[in-house]
Amino acid sequence: MVLSQQRTGSWHIYLINVIARSDSDETISFIVLGIASSGEALLGMTEGGHMKLDAALPPSGLKDVPAIAKAAEEIGFDALWTQETLHDPFLPCALIAEHTTHLNFGTAVAVSFARSPANIAYTAWDLAAQSNGRFILGLGTQVRAHIERRFGQPWPESPVKKLREQIEVIRAFWDCWQNGTKLNYRGEYYKITLMSPFFQPSPLTSPPAPLLKKRGALIPIYIAGVNTGLAKLAGELCEGFHVHPFHSPRYLKEVMLPAIEEGAKKTNRKREDVSVSVTAFVATTPEEMNFARAQISFYASTPSYRPVMDLHGWSGVAEKLSAHASKGEWAEMPMLITDEMLSEFCLVTKEDKLASELKKRYDGIADRLTLYTPFVPRERDEWWRKTIQPFNA
């Protein structure tokens, strides 16, 4: 479903939200940023604790990736994220690695249940090697309908448990390849015991970043989730967690961060050991406010996102939005998002104050920030530079 179309110079930007629902407590939604032409920082916070500003790669085709990646690096983004929507998420990463020198990059996210752990492990290994350690592996479960009916794979009884095993198997492959450890993983979903020299890649030669080395990790793994189940898993096992754009700072502080911390305690870790990567709505013009209001109304209509609305006492509004959505009454929905709601889910500010207000809003919450606004080279380049500069100071 296309919610909006914006024109920026010579580009048309289509913002599409694809949401699927399941009976589990985890629902993943992807933002499709479709673009058509008309004419040591891997973990987020460094040892010094700086918040990083990243960009999302619009899925406009592989031929556009080198130019976008070079521009993102030149302007000063810390990382560039790919998505699995219109295109494969890993192929652009190979081009980003080839055409940049210091830009971090990764998947946000690749659908894990559509692939075997071996597929993921080999691809991530090659990207880490090609980029001298700049690749971040981001995984998400997707939902039952897409896994079964689009990817043709079985849906697990416990998505969280299967993702846990996938991560453990991926790391077992990496440990085998790097350290010669015998491959012998036996779980409920996977039994992986075979690795012969003919199929074993060479060890990585680039040393891991200090924070990764301290944690015994070779390649950082982030996972994405909407509710608390996967947030707990991220806290327990992963280097990072991708936060959905439909959130409020209060929801993150009171619900998601405690869940990450709860998971971290199981493995004697702290919340600070997990990089929290947040995609944020921002609006500096009336047009951007209207756009954000429309997007937020659509997210708020989704039953799986109800806890976000419930926390703020807006359950009744969420029910009305769901009723409108079920009837396809999209035009009526944005009017139900009050200014108070908008300010909770979107940073509304003046353009010259955006960077400082972002840092204030997400201080103590986010280690990485990606704006919902798509990055398009040669369109608003100076605006991006001014926004990024305080994050890189």
Give, region by region, the residue ranges found by the protein language model.
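Active-site-adjacent structural elements that line small-molecule/cofactor binding pockets in enzymes
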Residues: 47-393
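N-terminal, intrinsically disordered charge-dense segments
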Residues: 1-13
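General helical structural elements
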Residues: 10-11, 25, 87, 119
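A cross-taxon signal for low-complexity, glycine/charged-rich
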Residues: 5-6, 22, 26-28, 34, ...
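Intrinsically disordered, low-complexity segments enriched in polar/charged small residues
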Residues: 10-12, 26, 155, 205
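Acidic low-complexity segments
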Residues: 17-20
